[in-house]
Amino acid sequence: EVERLAEKVKAEGIDGIFTGVHEFNLKRTRELCALCGMPFYATEEQLRLNFDKTFFKEQCVRAGIAVPESYTVSDPPLDAQLQAVRYPVIVKPRDGGGGVGVTICEDETELRQAIPGAVAGSPTGRFVVEEYVRGREITAVYTMKNGQISLSALRDRYPTKDHDRVTSQYDLSLMPSRYLPLFLAQSDPGFRRLLESVHAADGCVFFQGIAAPERIVFFECGYRLNALCDYHNIQDACGVSYLDMMIRYALTGSMGDADLSAEDPALPFFSGIFNM
């Protein structure tokens, strides 16, 4: 009921509209800001990086960023399609979020069983099948201000345990990442090209990937705040809070006067986030 919310915003004299980590809320907030004539940090194309995993991978390939191999599999799958699949693979909704409908598959039987869950987790009933890369999961966090792009943090994620056929849960996310030199050489230039290609000007974004010994592949984008709230760690380390900047943008249309050059992902100490 975005129209009713817009009426309430005007009636109550609301100064700004802001949202956090959920994809549904991002879409509604953008619509609400447009109705109320208030600033929102992301365009429809930029938000599509959140919602459409195939679109995100296409943009990565164009920018020279490594991504997992994709497989064409229909519902129900054809024998020829299944014969081309090399396991393990991960099956997930094309346009879902929050880990819903995501399954790791070691063989054809598990792949067939995973498809209905991925379809159910997609608002459009579409799913993707791609290479499951074994390695350390990492997250790259960028902040944008007036077209300036800054790598705010690179985090390594340490899992508690693997649950049956689903992605890992995490006890600890630690920065700086042990893979920072590899990331700076292989991935950072590509992400800057990607963000420039979608005309990223203000806001924050994170990219999730898997670091193997000699390569990093990326599979997910969040053009939004991330659920680990690492702005606390970044502010403690560098004195810059992208959360404060985002709130300021929602109120004024400007990210303020924070100095992004103070950010340095190569911290001289460790900073961690625990999942309790």
Go through the PLM ranges and name each one:
Residues E3-G13:
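Short, well-structured alpha-helical segments in soluble
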Residues V73, V102-D107, T143-K145:
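Short beta-strand-to-turn element immediately C-terminal to the catalytic PLP-Schiff-base lysine
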Residues V89, S150, V217-E220:
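Protein kinase-like catalytic core scaffold
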